[in-house]
Amino acid sequence: MKKQLLIVSVVPLLTGCGIYTNYQKAEEVPMNLYGEEVLIDTTTVGLGDLGWRSLFTDPQLQALIERGLQNNTDLQSARLRVEQAEAAMLSAKLANLPSFALAPQGTISSFDKHEAVETYSLPLTASWQLDFFGGIRNAKKQAKALLEQSRDYEQAVQTQLIAGIANTYYTLQMLDAQLSICEQTEHSWGESVKSTRALMNAGMANEAAVSQMEAAHLAVKASVLDLKEQINQVENSLSLLLAETPQHIQRTSWTEVTFECPESLSIGLPIQLLANRPDVRAAERNWEAAFYSTNMARSAFYPSVSLSGSAGWTNSAGGVIINPGKFLASAVGSLTQPLFAQGRLVGQLKIAKAQQEQALLAFQQALLNAGTEVNEAMVACETSRAKSDLLDRQVASLEKAYHSTSLLMLHGTTTYLEVLTAQQSLLSAQLQQTANRFKEIQCIINLYSALGGSNY
């Protein structure tokens, strides 16, 4: 009865010292994590719950993502980190088991040319560290947290890779569209130069008008070259994501883009970021690992208890040789209590506590960063969507203005400056219209990534 009472009283004591306490997962986040201006819709499936194949339906893009998931070196490195963490976890699990070793030994000796004496021993040794004070337990829980962190990191890299490939792919499509606009404009402005020169020959325009038109035409030709260079650079960037050499990227045209922005965006509750966003999960796992590291530092103040023993056959009994050999067994129990370690244990505990606080701050910052990214992506989506109709109407109005001023110039009722202004305004609006369409797509991709992005 006294022994049972002793055990019952020791367990709460050790728990109170912190070496047997368990990590409590974070379960609350600020409800306004996404910002006060972002309305939360919980009636539909969140964008972050969609699989990437459901969001990106372009076959060319899907093929590129598959290649990236297979070849990308950063993702492969993340997978190797998981393998390392799995090995560490296996080692931590087996630390509770006793260790065994076989150490056979034989000698042949002769003194003053007497008959040689042979001795042998075949011992099997065993040792077992008893985990009375939680050191092994906390190490195992820390290894498990680090394993989960490595898996979360792998998923975070995969989500970023998918978003990066998609963003780069649609960037190429946007640049293709802008290149087409500039090439058409180059042809149109070339015709305007010819028309202005004809008017000058007829005495209806001057040399300044021709020079201005030619300068504008040459500027567009330079823009065409710049866009071709940008396309090459973006193709190379995408090739790097695929871990492949520079190459032309097969893609659909901008007019065939199948990406549709949802009419209403559902982003879910802020608490879902703890479950959906892998980098936030990884930061929390790091905090959990630091928690158990602190427990391990506390347990180092307590005694270590171990059992060891050996058993085997030997023909050496001190100075006597016995043939045949006899069975020999021994067992030893030991307890080691740290008394004075030059402040090492106290220092390790302080370091562990500080690292735990750092991990908590990093987790809190990761959560704030995630909320900010969701907020910015949502506002960008709303802004680009609101601008879309305005830009469409602007382009339509400028097309009318350009055609009208061109006709008026041919009839001598307006100047070349008005035509030039209309041309430049139309080109700028068309490029802006294309860029805004790309921004609509990009902000959905960024929002998908900010919400965690399902990787199935």
Residue ranges and their predicted role:
Residues M1-Q70, K228-A275, S449-Y456:
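Terminal intrinsically disordered/low-complexity segments used for targeting and assembly
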Residues I19, G51, T57-Q60, L64-R67, ...:
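Small/polar-residue-enriched beta-strand and adjacent coil segments characteristic
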Residues A78-A92, V157, A163-E183, E191, ...:
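Amphipathic alpha-helical coiled-coil segments
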Residues A87, A95-N96, H114, S195-N201, ...:
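Amphipathic alpha-helical coiled-coil/rod segments that serve as protein-protein coupling scaffolds
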Residues Y120, S192, S211:
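Short, conserved phosphate-binding/catalytic loop or strand-edge motifs used
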Residues A202-Q230:
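Repeat-solenoid scaffold signature
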Residues G203, L242-E244, P303, H411-G412, ...:
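Short helix-capping/hinge motifs at transmembrane helix termini and TM-loop junctions
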